[in-house]
């Protein structure tokens, strides 16, 4: 059955800008999360994610645990995603909504590139993600919160950059490192103790993995490392060459001496 009430965009039809969301809004198809009234439901939540700069880019990492109240709902949740060729995004908060928001964000970046023939600047990407978080404000007031981290390689400034956000869509440039989620304070404290501007790739990867371990030791909602079962953080490295995902084999090699050295 074909629905003829909503047809394709016609040639010459006005669109506000080269935004996929604007196209959806024009057709009345934009995603809307609404909850009239508050009911006592238990939601699956993603927990600790982090990012830190190093000499040639940014490392972004996230643990794999998702919780529903005091219950461990999942032990292999992916929280760090490639946004496009030179940026990545990590999620914390209400897991289902966060994953959908990131899918839409990635589609938005792809749509913009197809329409404009060029990519958004890194600041433009960060600003658009802030706009999307702000669009979720009514749900945030009812406890359905999504707070991501965003990072990328800025070709104009020739360095890695990272951004944090608050629940109302405020965007903040972070110079060295950023964390969010239930174990964010512990991870941040560890990164503060080890970060320096001359970190190598290997040192940054080690710091990211050990920060997850430190957070898991203090926060029950953060999943630690389990080499026997193959449960390891998912980690991305962003440089001028693009986004690289670190394999479980490489992460295990990084993690083993860290775990051996913990008291």
Give each language-model segment a name.
Residues 1-263:
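Long, low-complexity N-terminal extensions
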